[in-house]
Amino acid sequence: MTELTLGSLFDGIGVFPLAAERNGITPIWASEIVPDAISITKRHFPDMAHLGDITKLDGGKIPPVDVITFGSPCQNLSQIGDKTGLNGAKSSLFYQAIRMIEEMRSANGNRFPAIAVWENVIGAMLSGDRMDYLAVLRAFTGAEIPVPASGRWADAGMVRGRRCDLAWRVLDAQHWSSPRLARRQRIFLVADFTGQRAGEILFKPRPVFQNSGLCSTGRLSAAAANRTDFIEAGRRIPIAQPFSGLRMRGGAKHRNLQMFLRSFGKRTDPFPTLLASELHPFAFWYEDDPIGGCVRFPTETECERLMGLPEDWTKYGADGKEICSTNRYTALGNAIALPCAAYIMAGIAEALGK
């Protein structure tokens, strides 16, 4: 079988390439502009070419690949952003990825890429009175897709247009690994340009949980908040209870006591979504010593665990120097949960390998 290849736009810290490599797909090139993110990825994928700014690339003049992945900027689509949607300065870069895909397909007789994967925040389904997501579907398919009769986009769906077979699904990272990851709801859209395999890739059941065993330290695990079976050496049971900074500030600002109290969460809650703009604190104590606990922020390594990434994935750049904490937290807040990406890459490898 011919080797499957991948190109990653808006690459970030290389989560899609990592997921691809683990499923036998070779990352060939990436496009990213943040220096530390590029350096982190170069360390892990020294043979992957870095092409730079997407706005300066011609899809017809770069190496064709079987799969193109992209998590285009979400700032203008997010419900905590400025809500300018696909017209916003950053989120409009979505169309640059579509342009590159079309240029590549035009240059090689519509053979490559066979598959495209788009990832974004669920706010994209609400942005612009839900018309921005319609624009996304039309940009991929080239079809005049109607707005659903309900006026709302479902969390999962399929469309077949003249350009591609398309499926989307909202995945929440907390359900895709054991120990439990942070809460992270994201849209994953798969477009199949050479067949009708999008639904097979995105909806077919596959194993996703990893055997984690017992943790041997009292530091926050991927289960960040909650596990009664999280037992450290010495049999002490640590407890982690996350806070929601947004709710806490909102409750204080609006003098809403119930909102403020809900910000403290429950021991059974997953850790809140990691954001590039802020960290969520959490209370940490041992079950046999609640008074001896503390409130702290997760470490960079703990944030990597909450995203399902290998420990110290973001610690060093290509030159071996440590990446500063602020830039590591920002990169992780912008990243994709690895188990979700790996599930999709497994589906692509299976579908294209037939």
What residues fall within each predicted segment?
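Conserved proline-anchored active-site loop of SAM-dependent methyltransferases
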Residues: 6-20, 54, 64-81, 115-122, ...
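Conserved SAM-binding strand-loop segment of SAM-dependent methyltransferases
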Residues: 47-53
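The conserved SAM/SAH-binding core of class I Rossmann-like methyltransferase domains
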Residues: 30-31
